From Swiss-Prot:
<keyword id="KW-0066">ATP synthesis</keyword>
<keyword id="KW-0472">Membrane</keyword>
<dbReference type="InterPro" id="IPR023011">
    <property type="entry name" value="ATP_synth_F0_asu_AS"/>
</dbReference>
<keyword id="KW-0813">Transport</keyword>
<feature type="transmembrane region" description="Helical">
    <location>
        <begin position="196"/>
        <end position="216"/>
    </location>
</feature>
<keyword id="KW-0997">Cell inner membrane</keyword>
<feature type="transmembrane region" description="Helical">
    <location>
        <begin position="92"/>
        <end position="112"/>
    </location>
</feature>
<keyword id="KW-0138">CF(0)</keyword>
<feature type="transmembrane region" description="Helical">
    <location>
        <begin position="34"/>
        <end position="54"/>
    </location>
</feature>
<dbReference type="GO" id="GO:0045259">
    <property type="term" value="C:proton-transporting ATP synthase complex"/>
</dbReference>
<dbReference type="InterPro" id="IPR035908">
    <property type="entry name" value="F0_ATP_A_sf"/>
</dbReference>
<dbReference type="GO" id="GO:0005886">
    <property type="term" value="C:plasma membrane"/>
</dbReference>
<keyword id="KW-1133">Transmembrane helix</keyword>
<dbReference type="InterPro" id="IPR000568">
    <property type="entry name" value="ATP_synth_F0_asu"/>
</dbReference>
<keyword id="KW-0812">Transmembrane</keyword>
<keyword id="KW-0406">Ion transport</keyword>
<comment type="subunit">
    <text>F-type ATPases have 2 components, CF(1) - the catalytic core - and CF(0) - the membrane proton channel. CF(1) has five subunits: alpha(3), beta(3), gamma(1), delta(1), epsilon(1). CF(0) has four main subunits: a, b, b' and c.</text>
</comment>
Length: 246
C-alpha cells in the first residue's frame, strides 16, 4: 500500500509513505526483511554500546549513564519481583530486562527520520513495525513461561490443565491467544504511530508533528512496559504454586 501527497493537476509527486514494501534478503532457503534486520542490528548495537559505556568504570556513587542503568535495573527487577515473586524473580530479570529495553529502543527508533536513508525497496522503520519481529518476541515469551513451569514441576506442570475438558480447552486457547495478542498489540500500535507521524509530516511538515512524536515516545515506553510485564506475569503464573508470593 502506498499513501502519497501530490500537487494538483499534472504536477509531480512530492512525497510518499510506503506500507508493506520490503527489502528482501535471501539467506539460503529463507527470505528475510532486510530493513528490519538493519534496524534490529542498530538497536542491538545501541544497547550493547550503552551497556558497555555505562559499566566500563563503575563507581560506588553512581552518576550519569551508570546512574540511569542502575535505575533501569531497579525498575525491571521490581517488575519481575512483583509478577514472579520474591523467591524466583532474580533469574528472570535478565530476560525481562532485555525484552523491555529491546522493545523500548525499537519503538523509539521509529520516531527518528529513518526515511531520509534510502534503500532499494521499502523504507527503514522500527523493528517492531514488522509483524515478524513481534511474533518472534511473543514466541520467546511463550517458550519462557512454559520452560519456567517445566523447570519447577516437570511434566506435572501440564497436569492441572488437563484435570477437566474445560480446563484443557481453556489452556489450549490461551496457548495460542497469548502470543497472538502480544504480537498484534505491539505491531498494531507501533505501525499506527509511525503512519500517523508520516502522514502528518507529509501534510504539515513543520512543528505540528513534534508534539505527537513526543507523545509516541511515551506510548512506545508504555508498550515496552506492557510487553515485559505480561511476559513476567505469564512466568509468574507458571511458577505460582511454588512461590509464597502467590
Amino acid at each position: 500500500m502506498e499513501l502519497a501527497l501530490a500537487t494538483l493537476g499534472n504536477q509531480p509527486l512530492i512525497a510518499a509513505v510506503e506500507v508493506g514494501k520490503h527489502l528482501t534478503w535471501q539467506l539460503g532457503p529463507l527470505s528475510v526483511h532486510g530493513q528490519t534486520m538493519i534496524t534490529t542490528w542498530v538497536v542491538m548495537l545501541l544497547l550493547i554500546g550503552l551497556t558497555f559505556i555505562g559499566t566500563r568504570k563503575l563507581q560506588r556513587v553512581p552518576s550519569g549513564l551508570q546512574n540511569f542503568l542502575e535505575y533501569a535495573y531497579d525498575l525491571l527487577a521490581s517488575i519481575a519481583r512483583n509478577q514472579i515473586g520474591e523467591k524466583q524473580y532474580r533469574s528472570w530479570v535478565p530476560l525481562i530486562g532485555t525484552i523491555f529495553l529491546f522493545v523500548l529502543f525499537a519503538n523509539w527508533l521509529g520516531q527518528l527520520p529513518l526515511r531520509l536513508f534510502h534503500i532499494p525497496e521499502g523504507e527503514l522503520a522500527s523493528p517492531t513495525n514488522d509483524i515478524n519481529t513481534t511474533v518472534a518476541l511473543s514466541l520467546i515469551a511463550l517458550v519462557s513461561y512454559i520452560y519456567a513451569g517445566l523447570r519447577k514441576s516437570g511434566f506435572g506442570y501440564f497436569k492441572h490443565y488437563f484435570e477437566s475438558p474445560i480446563l484443557a480447552a481453556v489452556w489450549v486457547l490461551e496457548f495460542f491467544t497469548r502470543p497472538l495478542s502480544l504480537s498484534i498489540r505491539l505491531f498494531g500500535n507501533i505501525l499506527a504511530e509511525e503512519l500517523v507521524v508520516a502522514v502528518l509530516i507529509l501534510l504539515v511538515p513543520i512543528l505540528v508533528p513534534v508534539p505527537l512524536m513526543i507523545l509516541f515516545l511515551l506510548t512506545g515506553a508504555i508498550q515496552a512496559l506492557v510487553f515485559s510485564t505480561l511476559t513476567a506475569s505469564y512466568v509468574g503464573e507458571a511458577v505460582e504454586d511454588h512461590d509464597d508470593h502467590h
